Amino acid sequence: MRLLREASKLGPRLLQYNGVTRNKPLSLAFCRHCSSGIVPNERIRNIGISAHIDSGKTTLTERVLYYTGRIAHMHEVKGKDGVGAVMDSMELERQRGITIQSAATYTMWKDTNINIIDTPGHVDFTIEVERALRVLDGAVLVLCAVGGVQCQTMTVNRQMKRYNVPFLTFINKLDRMGSNPSRAVLQLRSKLNHNAAFIQIPIGVESKFKGIIDLVEERAMYFDGEFGQSVRYDDIPAEFRAEATDRRQELIESVANSDEILGEMFLEEKIPTVADLKPAIRRATLKRLFTPVLVGSALKNKGVQPLLDAVLEYLPNPSEVQNFAILNHENSEETSRILMKSDRDSSQPFVGLAFKLEAGRFGQLTYVRVYQGMLRKSDYIYNTRTGKKVRVQRLVCLHADIMEDIEEAYAGDICALFGIDCASGDTFTSKSNDNLSMESIHVPDPVISVSMKPTNKNDLDKFSKGISRFTREDPTFRVHYEVESKETIVSGMGELHLEIYAQRMEREYACPCVMGKPKVAFRETISNTAPFDFTHKKQSGGAGQYGKVIGFLEPLEPESYTKVEFEDKTVGTNVPKQFVPAVERGFREACEKGPLTGHKISGLRFVLEDGAHHMVDSNEISFIRAGEGALKQAMEKSTVCILEPIMSVEIVAPSEFQGPVIAGINRRHGVIVGQDGSDGYFTLYADVPLNDMFGYASELRSCTEGKGEYTMDYSRYQPCLPSTQEELINKYLEATGQLPAKKGKVKG
């Protein structure tokens, strides 16, 4: 303790301890345990910082680490010193000024341990946000005061809803020209359907932004000192008192609508005290019935400390979040959900989820969220998917790319293991007979593909090593070899996603790559129900092959266009039950290549109603072939159409360029779904086929004199235009040397 007291006097200067020079202050930020033992759940928060690209997430995280004593000096994302933010540890991130991988850290604020994951804002890296939100208890949604709710904000909102994550909203960049926090809150309500209200309002905006008003405590807050590190409280300025009173009343009404206790006080016309209001905000936020809105400017060092206070006051600790594991019963397809116990001791068996893999300097690094029990260094744990027993050789907690060894981790902790062979989404337990798995991470399907090959044929070994590592790390990065064209095809979430992997291949494996033209992940489907009655027979002397299947194919609803489903409606033993999985396997294998253009078949259901088998000749391979043949037969009887991915596109540009921008979207077969305008700028929302979006960045720069910008996010699949379908079929026929007359019929 004496050492810590002396260290605190030194502040951010270099410290020497046991002969080691540190460039960070020795502070309680490094302390994960209190004097009585283990940090209780009440003093732990696991949060993520998520937002649309360029909303200021990484800058905000940098300020959080500085004010909590975790780092000694702040650096900007694109600062003149060229150092870059601490959380952007990858060289490509510092070079481009964007976050590519989610980065984890932890810090202390008012004796509470806060684990933070800073996530990317670009739609191409959406899997990083997906798996971060899967393992976090709460989140901070950052909005730009100028842009408000944007494309990726909507995606993050859907992800938070999927995993039931409570969150605060922080409206950032109030110092920017055109900032309008009130508009951002209205968009939270109208676009995202949240019961949102200010718990703080700014004292001025743009160049007049001086501080914030706390509506709960009814006081003004100013941030003094060179880096805003000193918070000064004062009375609310006279010119803002009326607005503060109105906004506080609006806050009380919003919370009263979602909290029973405050609602009763509101009906009885009682004025709630701070002691009444804070617990009510917390209760409503934890149930996702209310969204507290805070304001500030991370770049100008204003509003960050009150945000940290709000994380402690309004976001849940691990014991307040229910996490379930799926128990698979032996000899049965039935499953049951088991509630994980968040006690921070060794009384319960260990259960953890590997949510992210990364190749570090010392081998594979596996990020794990501990959901139950305790994990010690040197413990043996079991991978429930593979059944393999592995030893925890090294246990670390992470601060961006800096690792700190720890001896143990408890329920509620986020840590990392070395040397563990696993895949993203695997569950680990301390018992070998546990047939448990944590509820899985949603992995979106890739929407774009390109061919990739090393520039030098001698680098094939390096290329295959890099591809192997990247596919293990990122479930949205897929690779397959195309036999017809003899090319390696990589698929991902967008052009930037695949471009980053090509650059990483050169930087990390010294293997420069050549990329082909992007290819869109089209799908094929049917537009009407079609029956099948297919018999597979093969006689070659001795035991032959025989399998007969009867049923029908039917199209799925548009929201299920990326799925294929199988339904067994057989009664009796005409198709023995042991052969039904073989029929499904044959059907799914045949869905890999459609009849029109060779793209995957999806958006349909295979319903098996009846069939026949032979006592001697029927076997598994017979019914696999029968399943394949049944699909082909039914598709020949049905009308086949091609599906294409549609992107939600958001374009922001000066108002004088509105005409050319709209004309450009119309040329690309886009459908305009909405429009906003303010302060000389307009925002256009449109649904555009991904196939028509290639090269749009340069067109937008050209028609707006470099002043326009756009973002896009995957929305859905829908049938493409007849002209597009005809063009795709002709290209496929040319590539395969077939004649159009031999092809299946075309829709429309």
Curated annotation (Swiss-Prot):
Binding site for GTP: 51-58, 118-122, 172-175
Reaction(s) this enzyme catalyzes, per UniProt: GTP + H2O = GDP + phosphate + H(+)
Entries under InterPro entries matching the protein: EFG_II (IPR041095), EFG_III (IPR009022), EFG_III/V (IPR035647), EFG_IV (IPR047872), EFG_V (IPR035649), EFG_V-like (IPR000640), EFTu-like_2 (IPR004161), G_TR_CS (IPR031157)
A single GO molecular function term of this UniProt record: GTPase activity
Pfam (any one): GTP_EFTU_D2
Cell compartments where the protein resides: Mitochondrion
SMART domains cross-referenced by the UniProt entry: EFG_C (SM00838), EFG_IV (SM00889)
PROSITE patterns in the record: G_TR_1, G_TR_2
UniProt entry tagged with the keyword Membrane: no
CDD domains to which the protein is assigned, alphabetical: EF-G, EFG_III, EFG_mtEFG1_IV, mtEFG1_C, mtEFG1_II_like
SUPFAM superfamilies: EF-G C-terminal domain-like (SSF54980), P-loop containing nucleoside triphosphate hydrolases (SSF52540), Ribosomal protein S5 domain 2-like (SSF54211), Translation proteins (SSF50447)
Family the UniProt entry places it in: Belongs to the TRAFAC class translation factor GTPase superfamily. Classic translation factor GTPase family. EF-G/EF-2 subfamily.
Protein name in the entry: Elongation factor G, mitochondrial
Organism: Xenopus laevis
